[in-house]
Structures are given as structure tokens and as C-alpha cells.
Amino acid sequence: MGQKVNPHGFRLGITSEFTSRWYADKQYKAYVGEDVKIRKMMSKGMERAGISRVDIERTQGRLRVDIHTARPGIVIGRRGAEADRIRGDLEKLTGKQVQLNILEVKNPEIDAQLVAQGVAEQLSSRVSFRRAMRKAMQSAMKSGAKGIRVQCSGRLGGAEMSRSEFYREGRVPLHTLRADIDYGFYEARTNFGRIGVKVWIYKGDIVQSRAEREAQEALLRQQRRERPRRGPRSGSSGTTQGGTDAGRAAARAGDRRGRGGSGGGGGSAEKASAAEKAPAEKPATESAAVEGTPVETPAVTPETTAAPAAVTTAEAQGAPEKAEG
């Protein structure tokens, strides 16, 4: 189904919006006829203006028309003369006050309607249809499109039998409803007849609707403003890689000063920390190594240096026993 239906109508309310926004009960038929006449009038004498689309919005006794064009200077005219003429024609056609807005298309290379119109103009100028299609595809992909498909149908190259040819580059997922796909159609008038040009341009995925995206962006901006700033990190907290060792050393030094000091009353905490730092010392004598007698390590304080290892009573008695043997 996605291969045949118009991509804009297939995605109404999901990724695309209505080009005519109004409500009518009994005058529905008249309003639809007016919209068709307005768009036909816009496209009749404005071939060189590059009009992409025309949005129509109605309120009570008033009409608003938005013209999206790639060349706003042609639509406005010299000192606004052309815009005044268009506004007068619209007021004469509808019998209401008309607000005319002329909007510029920022990136015409990825606008499907403008791309189709450009290919059709080249076909009318007797340019090879393959060359025109490939040139349009290259410019669209360079401008940021994720995929494009161009199709030409008719007496291509002046052939007696009409046919259809298309070229595609990138991805064009027509069945994916969240895909933002732009579609355009234009007819080229040649000496051999009319050639229809269709263009599909894939610009990416749209997960949410427009209102939901705007609400989410506003919420994110508010959260950024209300977020508290983080204070400076201290070295003793041990939260950073460079401050971990320094913080531990400062904590150990404070613990030693609070418990033992230089008077030797530090107890087992100082001995454990000194034993972790100091390398394992060799036994004073060979008998101590054989019997497995532990050798005490002196207490290390920040103010004094370590004293030489003292010989225990068991070691002193073991030396003569070895001599007697």
C-alpha cells in the first residue's frame, strides 16, 4: 500500500500536516472549490518563482495564505507590487480579507516539489532525462537527504512507446509511517508530449508529533536551568584518581596523630599501617628462620625514624645452642 498511495496523505497526523486548515459545516463544498482555485492561480503565472506549497487557513471573515517559495523576490516583486496584485486577486476571488505571507524555502535541494519542477524544466529544455535525474539525486544527497527516488514516465527520449524509468539512491522506506518522506510531482511539456516527474525524498525518522517534540524540548530546557551546579572536588574525599592516594595518606596521618603520636602509644593501628608500608624484613639469625619465631617491627611515626630491629630473648639463647652442637 505504501508503494502506491501519496506519502503525504498516508502520513497525515503522524509526520505530515494538512495544507488546508479550516472547519465548515454547510459551506464545505464551496471552501474546497476555493482552495483548488487559489492553488491553481498560484501555479499559473508563477512557474519561475519555485513555489513549493500553499497553506490556507480560514477564520471567521478572514483568510490567511502562506506561500512557500524558493525565490521570494519574484513573488514579492518590485516594491511589493506583485504581492499587492496577488492579494487583490485573492480578495476578489474569495470576497474576504486576505493575509498574505511569503515564506522562503531554506534548502530547496531537498524539497521534493522543487526537485521535480527542476527536472521537468530540464526535460523541457531537451536535456537527457538520465542526466537530469542523476544531477538532481547528487545535489539532494549532498544537501543532507538520506535517500531519494526520481521517476520519469512518458515518451522518454522521443521514443514511440512510452515507458517509466526511475533511479534511487540511499533509503526510501515508503511503508514506515514514522519516516519523514517528502513527495512532489510535476509535468514537463515536450515536443513529444508530456512527461510526468515524481520525486520521493527521505529526510529521516520522526518519532513524535510536533506538539510532543516542542513540549519535550521545553521541559529539557527547564531542567537544564534548574539543575544545581556541582561544587569543587576536594583531594581528601578520594573521588578523583589523583586525589585518592593523597586522601588516604592524609587520613592515615591524622589517625596516627590522634591515637599514638610520638610517645609510642599508637598501638596496633600504627603497627598494621607500618607493616603494610614497610617491606618484609629478613630474620636476624638462621635459628629464628628455622623455628619460625616472629620478629617485631618498630613503630614508625612521622616525627622519628625507624629504630634498628631488636634481638629477642629466644634468639639470644638460640645462638649458644648452635655453637654447642
UniProtKB/Swiss-Prot annotation:
**Biased composition, Low complexity: where in the chain?**
285-316
- How is this protein named in the record? Small ribosomal subunit protein uS3
- Decide whether keyword Ribonucleoprotein is in the record: yes
Tell me where in this chain the KH type-2 domain is found.
Answer: 38-106
Keywords carried by this UniProt record: Ribonucleoprotein, Ribosomal protein, RNA-binding, rRNA-binding
Q: What does this protein do?
A: Binds the lower part of the 30S subunit head. Binds mRNA in the 70S ribosome, positioning it for translation.
> Which GO molecular-function terms appear in the entry?
mRNA binding; rRNA binding; structural constituent of ribosome
Q: Does the keyword Glycoprotein apply?
A: no
Q: How does it assemble?
A: Part of the 30S ribosomal subunit. Forms a tight complex with proteins S10 and S14.
| PROSITE patterns hit by this protein | KH_TYPE_2, RIBOSOMAL_S3
Q: Name one GO biological process term.
A: translation
Instruction: Report one GO cellular component.
Output: cytosolic small ribosomal subunit
Ranges for the region named Disordered are 217-325
Gene3D superfamilies recorded: 3.30.300.20, Ribosomal protein S3, C-terminal domain
What disulfide bonds does the UniProt entry report for this chain? Answer: none
